[in-house]
Amino acid sequence: MRGGELLGRAGLALLLMAAGAGARPRPAAAGGQPRSSVVLVACDSLDGRLTFFPGNQTVDLPSINFMKRYGTLFLNAYTNSPICCPSRAAMWSGLFTHLTESWNNFKGLDPGYITWMDLMEKHGYHTQKFGKLDYTSGHHSVSNRVEAWTRDVHFLLRQEGRPMVNLTGDRKRVRVMEADWRNTDKAVNWIKEEAVNLTQPFVLYLGLNLPHPYPSPYAGENFGSSTFLTSPYWLEKVNFEAIKIPKWPSLSEMHPVDYYSSYTKNCTGEFTKEEVRNIRAFYYAMCAETDAMLGEIISALGDTGLLRKTVVIFTADHGELAMEHRQFYKMSMYEGSSHVPLLVMGPSVKEQQEIPNVVSLVDIYPTMLDIARIPIPQNLSGYSLIPLLCEQTESEVSPRGPRPSWVLSEFHGCNVNSSMYMLRTGKWKYIAYSDGFSVLPQLFDLTADPDELTNVAIKFPVIVHSLDKILRSVVNYPKVSSSVHKYNKQQFISWKQSLGQNYSSVIANLRWHQDWLKEQKKYENAIDKWL
């Protein structure tokens, strides 16, 4: 398939005949069968709700639809931390964020951390990685880390460019995100030239930047990334009639943490309905381009006859709000930001199955080990997805007992002025903040209120109490919030000292420079007071 040429129905039928779909070998049951190979495609910022109704009405995603037809879709998969590095740290370690202490985009896993891929290599798998990894410490911009460290300071500064759209090229322009396409090509070539000749099973990882928004160079140091960029080719895949314009509360009615997020993301100004619709449409077009890259990988596996021997997993590190709740980006526990896509197809994975159980990215680690028939460590936060994918009973698989009926997500980074913790179970989403007292919690009934417009925490105190009790049994969140508070201060002090005489000029010219330079002394004083 040429770059981004979409898998048509006829193409898919041929692909499956070539791959021998239907005659699928049994999977990771111990014994005679060879172990399956695995391909994991992880993109950045794809809203998981686009993989099922009604979100799937907004944009044509044929590769995702192909995986749904010949595999399993998880309807309630969540990130464990809605920002790049901490989320990926959870996925590569199998541990919750408070256990790895991946507090922000600068603080992830130590470079030598043993991941599931390291263990698979040790147990005889050939391993290969292409594209975005971003799970170790020390990356992302200076602005990004300083904004995270200073979120407790009593000031309010815009840290991003205003979200905007940019149309590039013409109807022939398929490869908009060129770096991602180069990595996709490398993965395709590796499948066709290397994987096809291997005598051992392999695990291939492809990390994509899309559909993360693009940098906005006018917005200062290392810019923010507030530009939704696509070409007419991809925009034609979007069904404009199906785009929902989100309802916004007035600024005065917003939860205080939401207001801080909206302000620092430069979203508290006026936006016309047309602007909001365009931001959402361009975002969906970027998702269509992402889907085409997934299609290239599936096609390469089909062309080489490897598809029937390979478990294919597609997911994302987090979602994208795309102007829901008067915000873009992630860093929020609302569905647009925290709900991720998760689809699996391959040997013995049930076809056309939709799983309602709540799962999260920490489940990838034990799942990978399960596929490779490697004993699963008992200390992991996640549980293998194999019992759900293959309809086995839990007792056959996990000595730890059944998977819990909740998932945990937490956030400690920039654009949010409090640590937050989300417990999702049944129809409820409970969000606790900071020490559990100083900021009011939120409770949403996702069945009655899928858009999360009505916080019912005051209406259901008994539910709040019971969910808070579960949350505290998983994480001592007041203590964690306090640790993050101390970490932020220590990191900031050592950064400030390292700059010496240059401190005032460096801090003034970070992403918030447009606001900072108006009242430089005031903001420096606020920091001194905090310290």
Where are these regions (language model features)?
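Active-site-proximal cap/lid insertion segments
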Residues: 4, 24, 31-36, 45-58, ...
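N-terminal signal peptide
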Residues: 14-31
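A structural signal for well-ordered alpha-helical segments within the folded catalytic domains
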Residues: 36-37, 58-62, 111-118, 178-188, ...
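Short, solvent-exposed loop/turn segments at secondary-structure junctions
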Residues: 45-48, 82-83, 96-98, 133-136, ...
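Short, structured active-site-proximal loop/turn typified by the sulfatase FGly-forming signature C/S-X-P-X-R
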Residues: 52-87, 94-95, 121-128, 244-246
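Catalytic-site neighborhoods of secreted/periplasmic enzymes
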Residues: 68, 90-186, 190-196, 217-219, ...
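C-terminal cap/loop subdomain of S1 sulfatases and analogous C-terminal strand-loop tails that border
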Residues: 184, 318-324, 362-365, 370-446, ...
